[in-house]
């Protein structure tokens, strides 16, 4: 049993090393691609090419490139013999690292100026078949596949666990702290600290309207029953009691915003604490989301994109933004200004749509052209 536990611990440590090497290499490859796209027009980086930027900026770019390509090569050397343990998403990340390393390999750079090169002794596809057979006939192939399955299973369980923690811990902290700590403390010190129950004009207007309706209801009930309308003294007494009740209700509502703000701050602190103590799990969660997203078909990706854009920047999105802004204003105790809401609806969805189209043009069109083509077809060719 002790030997099995030691082997499990060693396997988990090895899995973490593989994930760390893959993440470092993948981030370095993405950095190189971003440098190519930003400074070299989506072409390979050439140290001998003079850019139309200051020399200090070009030196920084080349320094980042050299550091990133060295990280990619080191990661590729370490991951070369771990292919069987990688899931499809990790294999795609490894292929990206390989493509970047091959693009800047010395052999490729040296042979770039030539028009043709000597043919390989054997076709690459035939070599790939031999390599596949070699891996399948390897005595450790079954153990490698089982280790890869266990690692993917552990990755899924860790991702679900940290996702539940990120959702439930801040929510529970917010509700429990607001109910048992913040609300009693604010109610206790609100009479002595005026800023905890600052006056709100909209609450006063609502109280006046409720008092006017209450007076009309008294007179209407008296007329329905056939009784005489209450005298001025009786009406004044009832209105005074109702006004006191409305005042207490307004005072209670005026502290809700302060309670909500403090409870939200406590939830934010809890969220940050969970993130700080779950950094390794968050990296696993990011890989899980990447695998889920990239594992979708092109039609599913296009459908999700169209659904997202129609909800937030589509024809019916102004109604949703209005409800959302009203809820946020009520949560924090701000008056719902119609002019601000209309200005927000007229500008923010447009900015969001522009950012989204730019993302499609710069990133999605290069990473998944088939998804862009499917998106255009489902969107009516636009």
Swiss-Prot record:
Statement: the UniProt record of this protein carries the keyword Membrane: yes
Membrane topology: Multi-pass membrane protein
Family as reported in the entry's similarity comment: Belongs to the CemA family.
Physiological role: Required for H(+) efflux immediately after light irradiation to form a rapid H(+) concentration gradient across the thylakoid membranes. Together with PxcL, contributes to transient H(+) uptake following dark to light transition.
Transmembrane segments: 156-176, 257-277, 305-325, 340-360
Protein name: Proton extrusion protein PxcA
Entry GO MF terms: proton transmembrane transporter activity
Keyword Ribonucleoprotein: no
Main location: membrane
Alphabetical list of NCBIfam families matching this protein: PRK02507.1-4
Biological classification of the source: Bacteria, Bacillati, Cyanobacteriota, Cyanophyceae, Synechococcales
Gene Ontology terms: cellular component: plasma membrane
Naturally occurring in which organism (per UniProt): Synechococcus sp. (strain WH7803)
């Amino acid at each position: 049993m002790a030997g099995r536990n030691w082997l499990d611990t060693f396997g988990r440590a090895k899995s973490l090393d593989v994930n760390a090497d893959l993440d470092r290499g993948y981030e370095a490859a993405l950095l190189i691609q971003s440098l190519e796209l930003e400074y070299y027009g989506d072409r390979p980086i050439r140290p001998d090419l003079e850019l139309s930027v200051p020399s200090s900026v070009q030196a920084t770019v080349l320094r980042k490139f050299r550091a990133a390509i060295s990280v990619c090569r080191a990661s590729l050397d370490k991951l070369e013999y771990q292919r069987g343990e990688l899931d499809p998403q990790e294999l795609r990340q490894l292929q990206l690292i390989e493509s970047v390393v091959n693009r800047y390999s010395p052999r490729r750079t040296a042979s770039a100026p030539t028009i043709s090169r000597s043919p390989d002794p054997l076709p690459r596809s035939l070599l790939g078949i031999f390599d596949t057979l070699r891996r399948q006939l390897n005595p450790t192939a079954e153990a490698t596949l089982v280790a890869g399955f266990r690692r993917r299973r552990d990755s899924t369980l860790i991702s679900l666990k940290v996702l539940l923690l990120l959702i439930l811990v801040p929510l529970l902290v917010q509700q429990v702290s607001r109910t048992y700590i913040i609300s009693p403390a604010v109610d206790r010190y609100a009479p002595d600290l005026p800023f905890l129950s600052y006056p709100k004009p909209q609450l006063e207007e609502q109280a006046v309207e409720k008092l006017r309706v209450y007076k009309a209801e008294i007179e209407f009930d008296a007329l329905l029953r056939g009784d005489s309308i209450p005298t001025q003294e009786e009406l004044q007494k009832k209105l005074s009691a109702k006004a006191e009740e409305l005042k207490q209700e307004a005072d209670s509502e005026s502290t809700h915003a302060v309670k909500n703000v403090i409870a939200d701050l406590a939830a934010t602190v809890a969220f940050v604490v969970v993130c700080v103590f779950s950094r390794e799990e968050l990296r696993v969660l990011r890989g899980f989301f990447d695998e889920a997203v990239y594992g979708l078909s092109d039609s599913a990706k296009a459908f999700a994109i169209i659904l997202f854009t129609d909800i937030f920047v589509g024809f019916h999105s102004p109604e949703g933004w209005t409800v959302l802004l009203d809820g946020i204003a009520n949560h924090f105790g701000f008056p719902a200004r119609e002019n601000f809401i209309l200005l927000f609806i007229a500008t923010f969805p447009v900015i969001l749509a522009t950012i989204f189209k730019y993302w499609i043009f710069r990133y999605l069109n290069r990473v998944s052209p088939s998804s862009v083509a499917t998106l255009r077809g489902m969107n009516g060719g636009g």
